[in-house]
Amino acid sequence: MEHGILLSGADNIDFMIHGVFKYSFFGHEVWITTTHVCVLIVMLIIIGFAIVANRCMAKAREVPEGFQNVVELIVEKLDAMVDTPMGKAAPKFYNYIGTIFIVILVSNISGLLGLRPPTADYGVTLPLGVLTFLLIHYNQFKYQKPKEIWEGMCSPLPPWLPIWLPINLISEIAVPISLSLRLFANVLSGTVMMALIYGLLGVIATAWPAALHVYFDLFSGAIQTYVFCMLTMTYIANARGDA
């Protein structure tokens, strides 16, 4: 690729999003960018893993071995991660939290494959934040009475004195923005750093930055995935109240 999909081995410093090709849609010019290509690659990796895992579990043995061990370990760890913050409501959120965890994690660590991480594009992280925001307030309106919601919006003052209402409204609206910006900024900073290193070191960079890839892509990527999911579960649990 000429621009931006592959970061490693580049002679020029390039961490921008580029158009790969364009087409006309009802008279409007639409670009397919490096982000779209990288998202497609990430999705194909996840779908491929899911197909193999599904076939493996269809032939599952009572005593797990081989790839079945890997699949069961992943599921158990994801379920355990959801259990603590979500409590008795955890089974309802296994699929959602597990899905966004895997999608974000694979996107974050795709830099190990030389790709530009899709989560380094705010157009990817913002929908994830909005989706969580909608799920938070769906649970809030489902499990809390209007009176409880109003009291929460007026907190810490009594409900008949809504001085804090504007500030609490802003804090609610800021949830998807803060979630998405935190993930986007951390992943983008790692992408920029690696692009600068490759651009400045040139040929030497083919082997030396491997340790930095482990930090920026693997360690930092896993941490940001965990933080996003934990904040999501905390917000949802708070919205559900004692349900």
What are these regions (language model features)?
Residues M1-A243:
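Selective transmembrane helix interface/packing segments
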